[in-house]
Swiss-Prot record:
Pfam families: MMR_HSR1, YchF-GTPase_C. ATP binds at residues 31-36, 229. Keywords: ATP-binding, Cytoplasm, Hydrolase, Magnesium, Metal-binding, Nucleotide-binding, Phosphoprotein. It comes from Drosophila melanogaster. Mg(2+) binds at residues 35, 55. Belongs to the TRAFAC class OBG-HflX-like GTPase superfamily. OBG GTPase family. YchF/OLA1 subfamily. SUPFAM superfamilies: P-loop containing nucleoside triphosphate hydrolases, TGS-like. Monomer. GO terms for molecular function: ATP binding; ATP hydrolysis activity; GTP binding; metal ion binding; ribosomal large subunit binding. This is Obg-like ATPase 1. Transmembrane segments: none annotated. Residues 22-281 form the OBG-type G domain. The modification Phosphothreonine is found at residue 132.
Protein backbone atom coordinates (compact mmCIF):
# COMPACT_ATOMS: atom_id res chain seq x y z
CA UNK A 1 0.00 0.00 0.00
CA UNK A 2 1.50 3.41 -0.90
CA UNK A 3 2.43 5.63 2.04
CA UNK A 4 -0.03 8.29 3.09
CA UNK A 5 0.63 11.74 1.78
CA UNK A 6 2.10 13.03 5.03
CA UNK A 7 4.01 9.88 6.04
CA UNK A 8 7.78 10.21 6.16
CA UNK A 9 9.98 7.61 4.45
CA UNK A 10 11.29 5.00 6.86
CA UNK A 11 14.61 6.05 8.36
CA UNK A 12 17.51 3.66 8.74
CA UNK A 13 18.70 3.27 12.32
CA UNK A 14 21.84 5.22 13.16
CA UNK A 15 25.14 3.41 13.55
CA UNK A 16 26.37 3.76 17.13
CA UNK A 17 25.03 4.01 20.65
CA UNK A 18 21.56 5.43 21.14
CA UNK A 19 21.52 8.38 23.50
CA UNK A 20 22.38 12.02 23.98
CA UNK A 21 25.28 11.73 26.44
CA UNK A 22 27.72 10.72 23.70
CA UNK A 23 31.47 11.29 23.71
CA UNK A 24 34.15 12.07 21.16
CA UNK A 25 37.70 10.87 21.80
CA UNK A 26 40.97 12.57 20.79
CA UNK A 27 43.10 9.84 19.21
CA UNK A 28 46.64 9.86 17.83
CA UNK A 29 50.17 8.58 18.32
CA UNK A 30 52.14 10.04 21.29
CA UNK A 31 53.49 13.61 21.22
CA UNK A 32 51.27 15.01 18.47
CA UNK A 33 49.58 17.64 20.68
CA UNK A 34 46.48 15.79 21.95
CA UNK A 35 46.75 17.07 25.53
CA UNK A 36 47.58 20.61 24.38
CA UNK A 37 44.49 20.55 22.16
CA UNK A 38 42.37 19.12 24.99
CA UNK A 39 43.64 21.79 27.40
CA UNK A 40 43.07 24.77 25.08
CA UNK A 41 39.63 23.40 24.20
CA UNK A 42 38.61 23.16 27.84
CA UNK A 43 40.40 26.33 29.05
CA UNK A 44 38.94 28.52 26.33
CA UNK A 45 35.38 27.27 26.67
CA UNK A 46 34.22 28.87 29.92
CA UNK A 47 35.88 32.31 29.73
CA UNK A 48 35.10 32.81 26.05
CA UNK A 49 31.47 31.77 26.25
CA UNK A 50 30.63 32.71 29.85
CA UNK A 51 29.09 29.29 30.44
CA UNK A 52 29.64 26.99 33.42
CA UNK A 53 32.39 24.49 32.66
CA UNK A 54 32.49 21.00 34.06
CA UNK A 55 35.37 18.54 34.23
CA UNK A 56 33.89 15.06 34.42
CA UNK A 57 37.21 13.22 34.88
CA UNK A 58 40.83 14.36 34.60
CA UNK A 59 40.82 13.31 30.94
CA UNK A 60 37.18 14.06 30.12
CA UNK A 61 35.43 17.40 29.90
CA UNK A 62 32.36 18.94 28.38
CA UNK A 63 32.58 22.01 26.22
CA UNK A 64 29.67 24.33 25.30
CA UNK A 65 28.61 24.13 21.65
CA UNK A 66 28.73 27.66 20.20
CA UNK A 67 25.61 28.73 18.30
CA UNK A 68 24.57 32.22 17.16
CA UNK A 69 20.90 31.18 17.34
CA UNK A 70 21.28 30.34 21.02
CA UNK A 71 23.10 33.64 21.64
CA UNK A 72 20.26 35.51 19.90
CA UNK A 73 17.62 33.86 22.12
CA UNK A 74 19.65 34.69 25.24
CA UNK A 75 19.97 38.32 24.15
CA UNK A 76 16.25 38.48 23.27
CA UNK A 77 14.86 36.94 26.47
CA UNK A 78 17.63 37.93 28.94
CA UNK A 79 16.76 34.85 31.03
CA UNK A 80 17.73 34.05 34.61
CA UNK A 81 19.21 30.70 33.52
CA UNK A 82 21.23 29.85 30.41
CA UNK A 83 21.99 26.21 29.45
CA UNK A 84 23.77 25.54 26.13
CA UNK A 85 24.32 22.18 24.46
CA UNK A 86 27.59 20.46 25.39
CA UNK A 87 30.13 18.29 23.61
CA UNK A 88 31.76 15.63 25.80
CA UNK A 89 35.45 15.32 24.88
CA UNK A 90 37.87 12.61 26.05
CA UNK A 91 41.68 12.86 25.87
CA UNK A 92 42.94 9.34 25.10
CA UNK A 93 46.59 8.47 25.70
CA UNK A 94 48.74 7.93 22.61
CA UNK A 95 48.50 4.75 20.55
CA UNK A 96 51.67 3.13 19.25
CA UNK A 97 52.29 0.59 16.50
CA UNK A 98 51.33 -2.82 17.85
CA UNK A 99 48.65 -1.45 20.20
CA UNK A 100 46.14 -4.06 19.00
CA UNK A 101 48.60 -6.72 20.21
CA UNK A 102 48.94 -4.99 23.57
CA UNK A 103 52.00 -2.81 22.90
CA UNK A 104 52.24 0.35 25.04
CA UNK A 105 49.17 -0.46 27.14
CA UNK A 106 47.41 -0.66 23.77
CA UNK A 107 44.44 -2.72 24.92
CA UNK A 108 43.60 -0.17 27.64
CA UNK A 109 43.77 2.72 25.19
CA UNK A 110 41.73 0.87 22.58
CA UNK A 111 39.06 0.14 25.18
CA UNK A 112 38.92 3.89 25.92
CA UNK A 113 38.25 4.50 22.21
CA UNK A 114 35.55 1.83 22.31
CA UNK A 115 33.81 3.81 25.07
CA UNK A 116 33.64 6.86 22.74
CA UNK A 117 31.14 7.39 19.94
CA UNK A 118 33.24 9.36 17.45
CA UNK A 119 36.92 10.17 16.95
CA UNK A 120 38.98 13.33 16.57
CA UNK A 121 41.98 11.79 14.77
CA UNK A 122 44.77 14.25 15.52
CA UNK A 123 48.08 14.17 13.65
CA UNK A 124 51.18 16.34 13.92
CA UNK A 125 52.53 18.35 11.00
CA UNK A 126 55.07 20.52 12.84
CA UNK A 127 58.76 20.13 13.67
CA UNK A 128 59.95 20.85 17.20
CA UNK A 129 63.34 19.66 18.51
CA UNK A 130 61.97 19.86 22.07
CA UNK A 131 59.07 17.47 21.31
CA UNK A 132 60.36 14.08 20.20
CA UNK A 133 58.30 11.87 17.92
CA UNK A 134 57.70 8.26 18.93
CA UNK A 135 58.67 7.09 15.41
CA UNK A 136 61.82 9.25 15.33
CA UNK A 137 60.70 11.80 12.73
CA UNK A 138 57.56 13.72 11.84
CA UNK A 139 55.46 12.01 9.17
CA UNK A 140 51.71 12.54 9.65
CA UNK A 141 50.75 10.23 6.75
CA UNK A 142 52.63 7.36 8.40
CA UNK A 143 50.93 8.23 11.71
CA UNK A 144 47.50 8.16 10.03
CA UNK A 145 48.32 4.71 8.66
CA UNK A 146 49.43 3.44 12.09
CA UNK A 147 46.25 4.53 13.88
CA UNK A 148 43.99 3.43 11.04
CA UNK A 149 45.52 -0.06 10.96
CA UNK A 150 45.56 -0.48 14.75
CA UNK A 151 41.83 0.27 14.90
CA UNK A 152 41.16 -2.17 12.06
CA UNK A 153 43.25 -4.92 13.71
CA UNK A 154 41.38 -4.52 16.99
CA UNK A 155 38.08 -4.81 15.13
CA UNK A 156 39.39 -7.90 13.33
CA UNK A 157 40.15 -9.52 16.69
CA UNK A 158 36.69 -8.58 18.02
CA UNK A 159 34.97 -9.85 14.86
CA UNK A 160 36.73 -13.24 14.67
CA UNK A 161 36.12 -13.97 18.34
CA UNK A 162 32.37 -13.33 18.05
CA UNK A 163 31.97 -14.79 14.57
CA UNK A 164 33.47 -18.07 15.80
CA UNK A 165 30.85 -18.26 18.58
CA UNK A 166 28.01 -17.46 16.16
CA UNK A 167 29.26 -19.96 13.60
CA UNK A 168 29.15 -22.81 16.11
CA UNK A 169 25.55 -22.01 17.08
CA UNK A 170 24.26 -21.43 13.52
CA UNK A 171 26.12 -24.44 12.04
CA UNK A 172 24.51 -26.72 14.62
CA UNK A 173 21.09 -25.46 13.53
CA UNK A 174 20.71 -23.69 16.85
CA UNK A 175 18.93 -20.38 17.43
CA UNK A 176 17.50 -19.45 14.00
CA UNK A 177 17.07 -15.87 15.16
CA UNK A 178 20.88 -15.54 15.06
CA UNK A 179 21.08 -16.30 11.31
CA UNK A 180 20.58 -12.65 10.18
CA UNK A 181 23.28 -11.54 12.64
CA UNK A 182 25.60 -14.27 11.36
CA UNK A 183 25.00 -13.19 7.74
CA UNK A 184 25.73 -9.57 8.68
CA UNK A 185 28.94 -10.59 10.43
CA UNK A 186 30.08 -12.38 7.25
CA UNK A 187 29.50 -9.14 5.30
CA UNK A 188 31.45 -7.24 7.96
CA UNK A 189 34.27 -9.81 7.71
CA UNK A 190 34.50 -9.31 3.95
CA UNK A 191 34.95 -5.54 4.34
CA UNK A 192 37.15 -5.56 7.44
CA UNK A 193 39.43 -8.55 6.81
CA UNK A 194 39.25 -9.54 3.14
CA UNK A 195 39.23 -5.96 1.80
CA UNK A 196 41.08 -4.48 4.84
CA UNK A 197 38.76 -1.46 4.92
CA UNK A 198 37.05 0.44 7.71
CA UNK A 199 33.37 -0.23 8.30
CA UNK A 200 31.91 3.27 8.35
CA UNK A 201 31.81 3.70 4.55
CA UNK A 202 29.38 0.95 3.60
CA UNK A 203 25.66 1.27 2.86
CA UNK A 204 24.52 -1.15 5.56
CA UNK A 205 20.96 -2.43 5.90
CA UNK A 206 19.02 -2.42 9.18
CA UNK A 207 20.13 -5.99 10.13
CA UNK A 208 23.78 -5.09 9.51
CA UNK A 209 23.46 -1.95 11.63
CA UNK A 210 22.04 -4.04 14.48
CA UNK A 211 25.19 -6.18 14.39
CA UNK A 212 27.46 -3.13 14.13
CA UNK A 213 25.74 -1.56 17.13
CA UNK A 214 25.88 -4.76 19.16
CA UNK A 215 29.65 -5.10 18.84
CA UNK A 216 30.54 -1.37 18.61
CA UNK A 217 33.38 -1.79 16.13
CA UNK A 218 35.98 0.98 16.32
CA UNK A 219 36.10 1.49 12.55
CA UNK A 220 32.34 2.11 12.35
CA UNK A 221 32.72 5.32 14.39
CA UNK A 222 32.68 8.71 12.60
CA UNK A 223 36.14 10.29 12.26
CA UNK A 224 37.10 13.97 11.97
CA UNK A 225 40.74 14.64 11.09
CA UNK A 226 42.59 17.43 12.91
CA UNK A 227 46.04 18.50 11.71
CA UNK A 228 48.18 20.28 14.30
CA UNK A 229 50.37 22.90 12.61
CA UNK A 230 53.03 25.22 13.99
CA UNK A 231 51.71 28.72 14.66
CA UNK A 232 53.96 29.99 11.84
CA UNK A 233 52.46 27.59 9.26
CA UNK A 234 48.92 28.21 10.53
CA UNK A 235 49.33 31.99 10.17
CA UNK A 236 50.90 31.78 6.70
CA UNK A 237 48.39 29.07 5.69
CA UNK A 238 51.06 26.80 4.24
CA UNK A 239 52.38 23.40 5.26
CA UNK A 240 54.15 20.80 3.13
CA UNK A 241 52.19 17.92 4.70
CA UNK A 242 48.64 19.20 4.16
CA UNK A 243 48.30 18.13 0.47
CA UNK A 244 49.68 14.66 1.34
CA UNK A 245 47.31 14.31 4.31
CA UNK A 246 44.34 15.35 2.16
CA UNK A 247 45.37 12.85 -0.52
CA UNK A 248 45.53 10.06 2.11
CA UNK A 249 42.09 10.98 3.53
CA UNK A 250 40.49 11.19 0.05
CA UNK A 251 41.81 7.70 -0.70
CA UNK A 252 41.22 6.01 2.66
CA UNK A 253 38.30 7.93 4.20
CA UNK A 254 36.46 9.67 1.33
CA UNK A 255 34.19 12.48 2.43
CA UNK A 256 35.75 12.81 5.89
CA UNK A 257 36.39 16.32 7.20
CA UNK A 258 39.92 17.70 7.61
CA UNK A 259 40.44 20.71 9.89
CA UNK A 260 43.92 22.27 10.17
CA UNK A 261 44.57 24.15 13.42
CA UNK A 262 47.51 25.13 15.62
CA UNK A 263 47.73 24.13 19.27
CA UNK A 264 50.45 26.75 19.74
CA UNK A 265 48.29 29.51 18.21
CA UNK A 266 45.27 28.47 20.29
CA UNK A 267 47.40 28.38 23.45
CA UNK A 268 48.55 31.96 22.82
CA UNK A 269 44.91 33.05 22.49
CA UNK A 270 43.99 31.49 25.86
CA UNK A 271 46.65 33.66 27.55
CA UNK A 272 45.18 36.92 26.22
CA UNK A 273 42.15 38.90 27.34
CA UNK A 274 39.32 39.53 24.88
CA UNK A 275 40.71 42.79 23.47
CA UNK A 276 44.19 41.30 23.04
CA UNK A 277 42.69 38.23 21.36
CA UNK A 278 40.82 40.33 18.83
CA UNK A 279 43.89 42.47 18.15
CA UNK A 280 46.06 39.37 17.65
CA UNK A 281 43.49 37.75 15.33
CA UNK A 282 43.31 40.99 13.30
CA UNK A 283 47.10 41.26 13.16
CA UNK A 284 47.60 37.64 12.03
CA UNK A 285 44.41 37.50 9.89
CA UNK A 286 43.69 34.17 11.61
CA UNK A 287 40.94 33.08 13.96
CA UNK A 288 40.62 30.30 16.50
CA UNK A 289 39.46 27.02 14.96
CA UNK A 290 38.03 25.68 18.23
CA UNK A 291 34.42 26.71 17.57
CA UNK A 292 34.46 24.98 14.18
CA UNK A 293 36.02 21.86 15.72
CA UNK A 294 33.44 21.68 18.54
CA UNK A 295 30.44 22.16 16.20
CA UNK A 296 31.84 19.61 13.73
CA UNK A 297 32.41 17.09 16.52
CA UNK A 298 28.87 17.55 17.84
CA UNK A 299 27.34 17.05 14.38
CA UNK A 300 29.63 14.06 13.82
CA UNK A 301 27.89 12.35 16.74
CA UNK A 302 24.57 12.71 14.83
CA UNK A 303 23.36 15.12 17.51
CA UNK A 304 21.25 18.25 17.21
CA UNK A 305 19.10 20.29 19.59
CA UNK A 306 15.85 22.14 19.99
CA UNK A 307 15.34 25.22 22.14
CA UNK A 308 12.98 26.10 24.95
CA UNK A 309 13.09 29.82 25.54
CA UNK A 310 11.56 32.40 27.84
CA UNK A 311 12.46 34.93 30.56
CA UNK A 312 13.21 32.18 33.13
CA UNK A 313 15.47 30.03 30.97
CA UNK A 314 16.91 29.55 27.51
CA UNK A 315 18.05 25.97 27.05
CA UNK A 316 19.34 23.81 24.19
CA UNK A 317 18.10 20.22 24.54
CA UNK A 318 20.32 17.63 22.89
CA UNK A 319 18.60 14.93 20.81
CA UNK A 320 19.72 12.50 18.13
CA UNK A 321 18.87 13.25 14.51
CA UNK A 322 15.49 11.85 13.53
CA UNK A 323 13.93 12.18 17.01
CA UNK A 324 10.12 12.42 17.04
CA UNK A 325 8.29 15.09 19.04
CA UNK A 326 7.14 12.85 21.97
CA UNK A 327 10.68 11.55 22.55
CA UNK A 328 12.04 15.10 22.36
CA UNK A 329 9.47 16.09 25.00
CA UNK A 330 10.74 13.22 27.13
CA UNK A 331 14.17 14.89 27.26
CA UNK A 332 12.54 17.58 29.44
CA UNK A 333 10.55 15.18 31.62
CA UNK A 334 9.24 11.63 31.19
CA UNK A 335 5.70 12.89 31.93
CA UNK A 336 5.91 15.10 28.84
CA UNK A 337 6.45 12.03 26.66
CA UNK A 338 3.88 9.82 28.41
CA UNK A 339 1.11 12.42 28.21
CA UNK A 340 2.19 14.05 24.93
CA UNK A 341 -0.62 15.91 23.18
CA UNK A 342 1.13 18.24 20.76
CA UNK A 343 4.22 20.32 20.09
CA UNK A 344 3.87 23.98 19.21
CA UNK A 345 6.81 24.71 16.95
CA UNK A 346 8.54 27.74 15.47
CA UNK A 347 11.64 27.48 13.32
CA UNK A 348 14.30 29.78 14.75
CA UNK A 349 14.65 31.64 11.43
CA UNK A 350 10.91 32.40 11.42
CA UNK A 351 11.02 33.65 15.02
CA UNK A 352 13.97 35.92 14.25
CA UNK A 353 12.45 37.21 10.99
CA UNK A 354 9.07 37.99 12.59
CA UNK A 355 10.61 39.49 15.73
CA UNK A 356 8.38 37.84 18.34
CA UNK A 357 6.25 34.79 19.12
CA UNK A 358 3.06 36.83 18.61
CA UNK A 359 4.20 38.00 15.17
CA UNK A 360 5.20 34.45 14.21
CA UNK A 361 1.70 33.26 15.17
CA UNK A 362 0.08 36.08 13.18
CA UNK A 363 2.21 35.15 10.15
CA UNK A 364 1.17 31.50 10.37
CA UNK A 365 4.70 30.42 11.29
CA UNK A 366 3.71 28.91 14.66
CA UNK A 367 2.58 25.36 13.98
CA UNK A 368 0.93 22.62 16.00
CA UNK A 369 2.62 19.27 15.39
CA UNK A 370 1.57 15.76 16.39
CA UNK A 371 3.50 12.73 17.57
CA UNK A 372 4.82 11.89 14.08
CA UNK A 373 6.64 15.20 13.75
CA UNK A 374 10.42 14.83 13.41
CA UNK A 375 12.10 17.61 15.36
CA UNK A 376 14.44 19.79 13.31
CA UNK A 377 17.69 21.30 14.53
CA UNK A 378 17.04 24.73 16.06
CA UNK A 379 13.27 24.36 16.47
CA UNK A 380 11.79 26.45 19.30
CA UNK A 381 9.22 24.17 20.92
CA UNK A 382 6.48 24.41 23.53
CA UNK A 383 4.98 21.05 24.51
CA UNK A 384 1.41 20.38 25.63
CA UNK A 385 0.85 17.21 27.62
CA UNK A 386 -1.78 15.54 29.78
CA UNK A 387 -0.63 14.74 33.30
CA UNK A 388 -3.83 12.97 34.35
CA UNK A 389 -5.59 15.91 35.98
CA UNK A 390 -6.11 17.65 32.65
CA UNK A 391 -4.20 19.65 30.12
CA UNK A 392 -0.91 21.06 31.29
CA UNK A 393 1.13 23.61 29.47
CA UNK A 394 4.77 22.57 29.35
CA UNK A 395 5.81 25.87 27.98
CA UNK A 396 9.04 27.12 29.55
CA UNK A 397 8.26 30.32 31.40
Amino acid sequence: MPPKKHDEPERKPLIGRIGTNLRIGIVGVPNVGKSTFFNVLTQSAAPAENFPFCTIKPNESRVPVPDERFDYLVEYHKPASVVPAYLNVVDIAGLVKGAAEGQGLGNDFLSHISACDAIFHLCRAFEDPDVTHVEGEVDPVRDLEIISEELRLKDEENLLKNLDKLEKVVARGGDKKLKPEYDSMLKIKDILIDQKRHLRFEDWNAHDIEALNKYLFLTSKPVIYLVNLSDKDFIRKKNKWLPKIKEWIDKNDPGALLIPFSGAFEHQLTEKDELERKAYETETKCKSMLEKIVVTGYKGLQLEYFFTAGPDEVKAWTIQKGTKAPQAAGRIHTDFEKGFIMAEVMHFEDFKAEGSEANAKAAGKYRQQGRNYTVEDGDIIFFKFNAGAGLKDAKKK
